[in-house]
Swiss-Prot record:
The gene is Lrpprc. The keyword DNA-binding applies. Pfam families: PPR, PPR_3. The modification Phosphoserine is found at residues 1025-1026, 1028, 1137. GO terms for biological process: autophagy; mitochondrial RNA catabolic process; mRNA transport; negative regulation of mitochondrial RNA catabolic process; regulation of mitochondrial translation. Residues 931-1050 are annotated as: RNA-binding. One of its GO terms (molecular function) is RNA binding. This is Leucine-rich PPR motif-containing protein, mitochondrial.
Amino acid sequence: MAALLRPARWLLGAAAAPRLPLSLRLPAGVPGRLSSVVRVAAVGSRPAAGERLSQARLYAIVAEKRDLQEEPAPVRKNSSQFDWALMRLDNSVRRTGRITKGLLQRVFESTCSSGSPGSNQALLLLRSCGSLLPELSLAERTEFAHKIWDKLQQLGVVYDVSHYNALLKVYLQNEYKFSPTDFLAKMEGANIQPNRVTYQRLIAAYCNVGDIEGASKILGFMKTKDLPITEAVFSALVTGHARAGDMENAENILTVMKQAGIEPGPDTYLALLNAHAERGDIGQVRQILEKVEKSDHYFMDRDFLQVIFSFSKAGYPQYVSEILEKITYERRSIPDAMNLILFLATEKLEDTAFQVLLALPLSKDESSDNFGSFFLRHCVTLDLPPEKLIDYCRRLRDAKLHSSSLQFTLHCALQANRTALAKAVMEALREEGFPIRPHYFWPLLAGHQKTKNVQGIIDILKIMNKVGVDPDQETYINYVFPCFDSAQSVRAALQENECLLASSTFAQAEVKNEAINGNLQNILSFLESNTLPFSFSSLRNSLILGFRRSMNIDLWSKITELLYKDERYCSKPPGPAEAVGYFLYNLIDSMSDSEVQAKEERLRQYFHQLQEMNVKVPENIYKGICNLLNTYHVPELIKDIKVLVDREKVDSQKTSQVTSSDLESTLEKLKAEGQPVGSALKQLLLLLCSEENMQKALEVKAKYESDMVIGGYAALINLCCRHDNAEDAWNLKQEVDRLDASAILDTAKYVALVKVLGKHSRLQDAINILKEMKEKDVVIKDATVLSFFHILNGAALRGEIETVKQLHEAIVTLGLAKPSSNISFPLVTVHLEKGDLPAALEASIACHKKYKVLPRIHDVLCKLVEKGETDLIQKAMDFVSQEQGEMTMLYDLFFAFLQTGNYKEAKKIIETPGIRARPTRLQWFCDRCIASNQVEALEKLVELTEKLFECDRDQMYYNLLKLYKISSDWQRADAAWTKMQEENIIPRERTLRLLAEILKTSNQEVPFDVPELWFGDDRPSLSPSSRSAGEDVTEKTLLSNCKLKKSKDAYNIFLKAEKQNVVFSSETYSTLIGLLLSKDDFTQAMHVKDFAETHIKGFTLNDAANSLLIIRQVRRDYLKGALATLRAALDLKQVPSQIAVTRLIQALALKGDVESIEAIQRMVAGLDTIGLSKMVFINNIALAQMKNNKLDAAIENIEHLLASENQAIEPQYFGLSYLFRKVIEEQMEPALEKLSIMSERMANQFALYKPVTDLFLQLVDSGKVDEARALLERCGAIAEQSSLLSVFCLRTSQKPKKAPVLKTLLELIPELRDNDKVYSCSMKSYALDKDVASAKALYEYLTAKNLKLDDLFLKRYAALLKDVGEPVPFPEPPESFAFYIKQLKEARESPS
């Protein structure tokens, strides 16, 4: 073995990239790391602080904006699907540090359904089957990986060496036993050549089982192929010898490493640590830890977590506490710890997992209401014994880490249908005095109800009785009665099993059940004898069903009269008239038109009996009933219902070309004849100016001074400025002022005067011109501000300090330009040009103090670093850190060191604990390097940011390849490709195409499948005669106007070209059409489109223009045209925007066009890139059906989707808010009533509370407070949907004039006032509406309750009080709103 390793010295020297990813540092099975296979680092280096699992970094890639070039449909679709999958997995990893099996399964199924998955998608899925699945056993993970491999291979994915390497990595992470020789044979059979990464992982596979002989064979292969032996190999051999029982040789590996020229790093020591931990040798572990502490190396939290796993897995949990004491628990390491906890529990080491959990710290400002929830949920999934899980819950609560641990566990148990666990937890909660509510049992009852399991129902009722919970009406009606033949048999069964309570709840449930079955006589008897208050609204839906199933009109009338006149049933608002009116409306609305027609006579009789009983209904409800009767084609009944209207409460309710000599002769002749010369004089002056004949122009002006006008002076001033004639320019300006003090020159002439006067040190005159611009409100455009910059920069380059300072001060003070970083550059430049670095730094700092900008700080720092000005560097960094934060300071210093070639110092900066990627800043430096061809600096940036947390590695290498392409350096590009593989980077398709282009240009083989991009030039071939130079300029002018958003000017150019029969490119027409559509110039856009289609073969609009066209067609109600546009765009494989498709669907719904909506649904099926939620179709199809009076069909479809066992949409995402809102806005009362019934049924029968909560919130938002209150009374569980209510409050608080809505919500659900998110939203809304009184009341209420108020809440309240001139009763938080928003967001996102 030593003989194989000693020659590694020269191999290592030849290695282009000796490092391996950090992901190769974990022992097998631990989340995020492999078995003792260690990352190679430079001597003394450590991974950047803040990094997570390396696999997590695979997904931390910022979604790219698509290239401007249009991609063909197959490529674009494949790429967009990859981005979608990446986004889903990335979000999960960012949020939790792991991936769930369900999410990975959904992404896998979506990938397969695309029909043409790509190699990148395969790589992404395979790499997700390892340690990112801590909630799955090792065998399940590997089985999943094999399933993905086989399925994608069937679908035609071509695997390359990166896929085999990914599979190897999964095997190692999952401790999968396999034959490395068979694996190599499999690769050979697929004609895939192994690379260095393959051999390194095969060595790790042998070493994991202690097979040193096998590892030696692979080392031999590597030697013959001249592959470098990296530290990862040495570290694997440490593990191999240890697992072979040879600890002496394991430790000797460190000596061999030194002989090979490598100083063992912390990764190698970590491998040795794990080896001793697996043997339970705590003494050796302590010695290694002590040795590393005394060296330049250090261990990170995640390293200690590996050691904990090694001890636990080997059966030595007694040493875990000692290792836990060494962990610092930095924020970035929390996800690693959480994943270790989950995996320990999965491996039946839940006690150790709980020990680690208890050691985790609470994040800053954490509310202690969800700490450890992830662990408890996983324990429920693993079906741990109830007594153990309850013990965990109590220990968490006693440690004040999770205030509602038992409640949360109960929630998980009910969701997972763990009856025994749920019962045990409920009993524990009851013992502690926590109220157990009936709806907690509904998920358990629902399963038995579906199978008509009477004994199961009885068992659950017994459990309810045992834990002291009385079933409510909904429980009986929805879950108990349906399992029996009659109410009597229910009563008998409950009595027999001693489950019938003495309260009236069961009797009231019986009444509802009788109503449902049409037994009206029993209902009447009950209502007459009832002594308890009973709400009419709670009976309404049931009575409607009862009335329809019984045709005894006398009973109809008697029940209605009783409910109308008896105060027990209509004592609450809105009163008896409204209650009966809505009941009649809903009764008729519940019937079909044929049913109403068949029962016309009985309804007439019913109305007349009500009249005799003196029952009244309001006028507005009467009108609604009339509309219904007209719709049902029974207008004859209107006169019969009219007699019920309460009349006492009725209320009712957009020159030809000439030479200068000719003009001068004409001018003299006119003067001699005594005729006006103004026009000719102006024409002559303009001509001389155009000829740049300043001397002659000034002579003409002097000769005819008495005849001069403002326009002539303006032209002369501009001419003198162009000729750098400050004296005459200033004199002419003074003459203009004497002639007409109110005259205003155009902006360009003022700017020209400032420039020439400043250049000639006439600062006061220049400042006076600036003051005049301000006084006369001269138009300041972006081009004007740019001109100011050039004036200042010119003075700076000339070294004119005072000129720069005074002109800048005047420009900014007068408000002619904002004090931006760009306009302030010259203040620093003037000192840099003079080499005065202290003054340059002071100028930059002064700008920040005065204007909050820090111009040219990078250039100043670079100069200071070059000169070695340590004191000034420290001063600069202290200032930046104080004003812009430590992270900004670190990046400034990092870039300065990179720019100046101080790479060791740059490395130290980027490895600072806690630093994380800032994509915008990194891209800024990349662009700077590319623009100035700084290859070495960019290469070092890419190298040093390898371990930077959340760094988009593909983006970094893409920038590097762009630079290599400029220099045609294919060798470096190829080396970059090797490094990308070693880092396990999943390249985007654009990166692969760029690399392939570099290699092909240099006649090199491309080692991967190149994603194809088909595109053609549809520019019409025009002969030279038809495209003159002048016409080309016209096209450029048109595009220039488009860029400036000048739609009218651009369209006029098009008209001119059209007359001349000049044809532009299709891109130009698409751009013009898009601009016209954005300006809502629909007719003109269609004109351009028609012309392009008739003159360019195959002309089509691009995605963006077609999307705009659809939106404009919808706005004009051209729905058929919009549908045709959408179909054409999809046929061209374009991807229309989400808003365009959504607006078309919504417009079709309001027209009741179900067929067209379903056609769109078929058209966009599989196009996940549009981002259309399935709820868009569900909501709008239902709305369209309701518009067609097909209410029952709409309700049935929604109910089926909600209650189906194979739900396409998870219940928590099944949002019906849009449907409810439109039904309320369109005043579709029958539909609203049926939706209300359906929503309540879903809540009562299936414990699905989102629909009824959405309805409640829409009623509140639309001002229907009474209806909302009644709904809340019927379904009290709405008040417990805290997450939905919080989201509603957040969205509402962002809209003006919505404070009353939030007030109403808090009145209906008072307990929300103590929710920190809700009261923060309330204050935000009050501040937005300037509602000081409400804000004061809220503040006083919260302070009286001694609730902790965050700084953002206090900042908003203080700002509101200051706006109205009232004193602030507390010290105002000093930072900006943005600061506190970010602070609060980070606090809430902190994992617990």
